[in-house]
Structure formats: structure tokens, C-alpha cells
Curated annotation (Swiss-Prot):
Additional information: During catalysis, the active site Cys acts as a nucleophile attacking the alpha-carbonyl group of tRNA-bound glutamate with the formation of a thioester intermediate between enzyme and glutamate, and the concomitant release of tRNA(Glu). The thioester intermediate is finally reduced by direct hydride transfer from NADPH, to form the product GSA.
Taxonomic superkingdom: Bacteria
InterPro entries on file: 4pyrrol_synth_GluRdtase, 4pyrrol_synth_GluRdtase_dimer, 4pyrrol_synth_GluRdtase_N, GluRdtase_CS, GluRdtase_dimer_dom_sf, GluRdtase_N_sf, NAD(P)-bd_dom_sf, Shikm_DH/Glu-tRNA_Rdtase
Any single biological process term in GO: protoporphyrinogen IX biosynthetic process from glutamate
Key words, A-Z: NADP, Oxidoreductase, Porphyrin biosynthesis
Subunit record text: Homodimer.
Keyword Oxidoreductase: yes
Site (described: Important for activity): 101
Enzyme Commission (EC) number: 1.2.1.70
Protein name: Glutamyl-tRNA reductase
């Protein structure tokens, strides 16, 4: 089993590029699995990240870097992006880095608002979608199920995310503080129909806002509101919707920000949750208009305590080690099976001698049962030790012992070298390249 992943997120690129990469990734996992290029694949696509997890087949024609390059190039072509740009933009992980990264992500430690819980459900839905489409290999299922357990443990054992914070919830809290009236009386206009827009709709309703309109530059507002409620806004009706809105929320990451000149006069709060910006920053200079950006959200969000973050990272590191240890232990199955076959073959040969000399009698049956119990007992300790040594990275010692004592030839399982936890820059410190092409 060789697992890897490709990642593009808000930490390294703008939201518009993430969106284009996500579009380019549509169908890539299914295609790679159907062609036999991958044994399994799961795509995690959210409003601010694209992650493609893959498993190489047992006898792959390319190594991990080669497979990653092929996938990145295919995504680039489908997205209409420069291949070299995509290769340089997407982070690549393999071996023990994969569970460590996924467990960190699912716990909210990689999120723009540390500790947010939306990502946990998104990871769960990514697995369900892959299982439904038939691209989720057993090893990838084990990885994502372990990620879900890790997220639950982080939530139960630390204070991380206990307030149920998210980018959307923090932004709406800020908007509530600076907008006149209460949510039941406010009129909201949402730009976008993606995951962020869906989360925004749910958060607005939780706060009692019922008068919600939705605009989509791609024309998907009608379909979105049919499924989630609200009223669709067309290009023709957009000026009227802007005039009616008390709160305007952008989460589409459109190709070009709306200029300030399109905003009608009057007091309103504008919330821009798109990393690529839905609205020109000059909106903040308009009379009686308050602009809330992602940077505003990061500054305003109550910081998680160092203790909570440290405790969460400890859980993630332990879970990643446990996953790798269990994986390595399972890789010793071939050696265990070889030892059992050898031992049982010796037993069967001796039992044949007993039958030849004494025939099939009640005594012979009792002897066979006793000998098989004895063999199972003798094999117990070597079986346990095989998994222990594998978990300690000493599988080669066990294999050498089998060869020396029994003449059994078994391939040594691949044991990835331990890698140090990756250190990530704060999103605000990381340059975000923009797509070309």
C-alpha cells in the first residue's frame, strides 16, 4: 500500500485558483481508477481547498512523484491552467505525511479559523462520495475513518472548536455588531452557490434571518435556491437586490471583484469571504458602508488557547503514528502466513504418518486435535512478535529470522522512514500566487 495526496489550499493560492483546480479535478479520480493508474482515490473539495488522495496499485508503472505529476498535469489541462504553475502550486505528500496531513486538516488545525468544525463534515462527505462512485479503496477508507476518529477525539479531549466557530459564524457575529436592527428584520444578499454559500445560508437561518436572496454570476442561483431556499437573483434584478440588502455576503470567489460604483447609496454591511475578493476593497470608502474581510475575521476570531492547539496536535501526531504502526503491522501478514503454512505443513506430514500406522481411529482424532492446539499455541507468540517488530520498524529482523531458522523467503515490507511533523506558515504570511492561463 502506497498512499499519497496533492493539496492546494488557501494557505498557498487564492480562492479563485482553488476553485479552478477543483473544477479541473472533476472526474480525475474516477478516470484514474478506471484506467488502473490508481488503486483508489478520494477527492476533498471545499470552498478553500482541493485535496486528492490516491493509492498506487501494487505493481504500478510509475512511482509516487510520477503519479502525482500525471494527476497535476491532468487537473491543469482540464482547468485551463499552466501545468508548471499547478505543479509548483500543489503541495505533495506521501507515506507517513499523508495521515498526519489529513488528521491535521480534519481537526481544524489547517483552517483559516483554527478549530472550525465544517471541515469534519466535508471530509466525511468526501469519503461517502468516493464510496458511492467506487473509487475508495479499502486502505483509503481506513485512512478516512481514522481521520474521523481523530477529529472526534480532538473535539472530545480538547477545548479546540468547542464554541463551534467557523469563518462564516465569526463573520456574521461581526456583521451583527455593526448592522442596525436584528437578523429577523434584516434583508441578506448572498453571492455564490458553493459550499461557503450553503454554510452562510444555514448560519443566517440559525440567526433568524428569513429574507435571503442569492446571486450567482454563473447562473446557478435558481438551482441553488430550489434546493436550499431563498430567492434567486438574476443579472437584471441584481441592482434592486443590492438596494434592498442590509447585509451583502460574498463567497463566490468570482473572476473579477464587483466595483464600488455598482453599490447603491445607503447604509449596509458588506462581508467578503472570498480569498480572491468578490468586492473591490474601495467599497469600504463608501459612505455608511462597513466592509468585513477574511482578515477582519482572522483578527476578530477569539484565539484558541495554546493549550488546546498543543493538545490537538499531540492527538494528531499520536493518531498518525498509530495509523502507520497498524499499517506496517498489517504488512507483516505475508510473513505470518508463510510461517503458519510451513508449520501446518509439518503438522500434516506427521499426522499422515500417524494415520498410516494406526488408521482412522478415535485415538488418532484426539491426537490430531491435541497437536493442532499445540501448534496454534506455539504460533501465538511469533505472530504477536511479528506485529510488534513491524510497529517498531524492525520487520527486516523478523524476516531474517524466518530465513535463517526455516529457510522461508519472504519479501521485506516497505517501512517508510519517520518524518518530522511539517511546519506550516500562517496563511497571512504565505504568498498566494494567482493562476495564469
Amino acid at each position: 500500500m502506497v498512499l499519497f495526496c496533492l493539496v492546494a489550499s488557501h494557505r498557498t493560492v487564492d480562492l479563485n485558483t482553488v476553485a479552478r483546480l477543483s473544477t479541473g479535478a472533476l472526474g480525475v479520480a474516477e478516470d484514474a481508477v478506471s484506467r488502473g493508474a490508481l488503486a483508489g482515490a478520494i477527492t476533498l473539495s471545499t470552498c478553500n481547498r482541493l485535496e486528492l488522495y490516491g493509492e498506487l496499485p501494487e505493481h504500478a508503472s510509475v512511482d509516487v512523484p510520477g503519479a502525482q505529476q500525471q494527476l497535476a498535469e491532468r487537473i491543469a489541462r482540464r482547468a485551463g491552467l499552466d501545468e508548471r504553475f499547478v505543479l509548483e502550486t500543489m503541495d505533495a505528500y506521501e507515506g507517513p505525511e499523508v495521515p498526519r496531513h489529513l488528521f491535521t486538516v480534519v481537526s481544524g488545525l489547517e483552517s483559516a479559523v483554527v478549530g472550525e468544525r465544517e471541515i469534519t463534515g466535508q471530509v466525511r462527505r468526501a469519503l461517502a462520495g468516493a464510496q458511492q462512485s467506487g473509487t475508495a479503496s479499502p486502505h483509503l477508507v481506513q485512512l478516512f475513518e481514522a481521520a474521523a476518529r481523530t477529529a472526534r477525539e480532538v473535539g472530545a479531549s480538547t477545548g479546540l472548536g468547542e464554541r463551534g466557530r467557523s469563518i462564516v459564524s465569526v463573520a456574521l457575529d461581526l456583521a451583527d455588531d455593526i448592522t442596525s436592527g436584528d437578523w429577523p428584520e434584516r434583508h441578506a444578499l448572498v453571492f455564490g452557490t458553493g459550499a461557503y454559500a450553503g454554510a452562510t445560508m444555514a448560519a443566517l437561518r440559525d440567526r433568524g434571518c428569513a429574507d435571503i436572496e442569492v446571486y450567482s454570476g454563473s447562473g446557478r442561483a435558481q438551482q441553488f435556491t430550489d434546493q436550499r431556499g431563498g430567492s434567486p437573483v438574476t443579472d437584471e434584478s441584481l441592482p434592486g437586490a443590492l438596494r434592498r440588502a442590509d447585509v451583502i455576503i460574498g463567497c463566490s470567489g468570482g473572476s473579477a471583484p464587483m466595483p464600488a460604483s455598482r453599490f447603491p447609496a445607503g447604509p449596509r454591511t458588506v462581508v467578503d469571504l472570498a480569498l480572491a475578493r468578490d468586492f473591490d476593497p474601495a467599497v469600504a470608502d463608501l459612505p455608511n458602508v462597513e466592509l468585513i474581510t477574511l482578515e477582519s475575521v482572522r483578527v476578530a476570531a477569539p484565539e484558541e488557547t495554546r493549550e488546546s492547539v498543543a493538545a490537538a496536535r499531540e492527538i494528531v501526531e499520536r493518531a498518525a503514528r498509530d495509523f502507520e504502526n497498524a499499517r506496517t503491522a498489517r504488512s507483516m501478514d505475508q510473513a505470518i502466513v508463510a510461517l503458519r503454512k510451513h508449520t501446518m505443513a509439518v503438522l500434516d506430514a506427521e499426522l499422515d504418518k500417524v494415520r498410516t500406522h494406526h488408521g482412522c481411529t478415535g485415538a488418532e482424532e484426539q491426537i490430531e486435535m491435541a497437536m493442532r492446539r499445540m501448534v496454534r499455541s506455539l504460533l501465538h507468540t511469533p505472530t504477536v512478535r511479528a506485529r510488534q517488530l513491524a510497529a517498531e520498524g524492525r520487520a527486516d529482523e523478523y524476516i531474517t529470522g524466518l530465513e535463517a531458522l526455516y529457510g522461508l523467503e519472504v519479501a521485506v515490507p516497505d517501512v517508510p522512514e519517520e518524518t518530522a511533523p511539517s511546519t506550516r506558515q500562517d496563511p497571512s504570511d504565505t504568498p498566494r500566487p494567482r493562476a495564469v492561463g
